[in-house]
Amino acid sequence: MTQLSTRLVRLLNMVPYFQANPRITRAEAAADLGVSAKQLDQDFNQLWVCGLPGYGPGDLIDFEFSGDTIEVTFSAGIDRPLQLTSPEAIGLLVALRALANIPGVVDPEAVRSAIAKIEAAAVVMGNEATGSVASVDTRPFSESHAVAAVRAAVRDKQALVIDYYSASHDTLTSRIVDPIRVLLVGDHSYLEAWSREAEGVRLFRFDRIVVARELDEPAAAPETVRKALPDTSFFDDDPLLPSATLWVARSVSWIFEYYPMRQAHELPDGSFQAVMTYASDAWMTRLVLGFGSAVQVQAPEALAYRVRNAAVAALESYQVTAQA
């Protein structure tokens, strides 16, 4: 997970944690939650501005601090399962149906299951969400034969032969792969698999798999690879692509949710350092410039110089315009 995702999970768990451990000390809580005392205080500050609509006194999550101990005084309902209102149920169902119609993004079976559960809950609550949403889009979910074959191979643990389009090289190649798992990252689904040709783990984007055929042999990825954590380095299927070390200001930490990065870690001042792989210097230069001073290239030097020169050229063009 990204830094933001990890923190969100921790924030959601903090209120139930402190309710289950009343009067626990700051040091003990920080140790249990795996964060520093400074980060724990930042999490408290974040939770203090979260709560129920109205967002006034008595609506926000609150804690009582007595000496060095901590206790929850108002949970704002975060410790209980969410009960959807009728408009919320309708919104979720519409979003799920729209998401399901984007090829390769989600597993249709998972979407059907989620919709069925929400509709059932809506009926129990006496809502009219089921009838309201059914008229929006009742077409059955479907995906390409290639994507269906990929999901089946992952489920059955069978080897695959795929025709895959490489956007960086603009080529279509045929590969035999041993599926490991399906990953959902950002707006796309990826097949993580062992490439027999490259003898390494590669990611294959669903919408770039043109043809897929299940082979009559079991998947044979190395055991160490199967047990390893998911690899979400999007461009690992092309080892010739360069990588850049970036400094990212905390104010734009949402960048991790939109661009694939690895080796991300938080610095003492709250900013971040991460490594990002990219396809071309020109594209990377435009990306970094778009964030102003909030994202800076630390390495390689050639890319840093390119970004700096592009920024200077942009400033000079404004000066020329002003003089004219």
From Swiss-Prot:
It comes from the Bacteria. Residues 139-219 form the WYL domain. InterPro entries: CBASS_pafABC_assoc_protein (IPR051534), PafC (IPR028349), PafC_HTH (IPR043839), WYL_dom (IPR026881). Belongs to the PafC family. Does not seem to be involved in pupylation or substrate degradation. Interacts with PafB; with which it probably forms a heterocomplex. This is Protein PafC. It comes from Mycobacterium leprae (strain TN). The lineage of its organism: Bacteria, Bacillati, Actinomycetota, Actinomycetes, Mycobacteriales. The gene is pafC.
